């Protein structure tokens, strides 16, 4: 398989993981109720673990190569602050667009990081694509449940 087709396939799989999570959320009636709650907590924890793994295994080591520790810390905190402000604004607005904006604010940086990893020819692109896919399954799961809950 050519490198271009490999990149297309890996990015497609990472992106399609979100609808897979939504399909899993479609079958949500698990008895007993406590088991359903534990499953939701487990899926959310799995997504958080995948996200932290992507940061620790791929993004931070790549960033350290190009930035000093101080600059990396400032950029990390600035990004965290920007997303906190966005989250506060979205929770205040409480519109139907809030979920879309939240998903896009996650999708765009993921796409940029994945594209940059593959453009640099780094083998970490494959790992990053796998970690993004693992994180997107719980994201799709939770987004489906939130959208369904807000429509009733």
Outline where the language-model segments fall.
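Intrinsically disordered, metal-sensing/regulatory segments
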Residues: 1-152
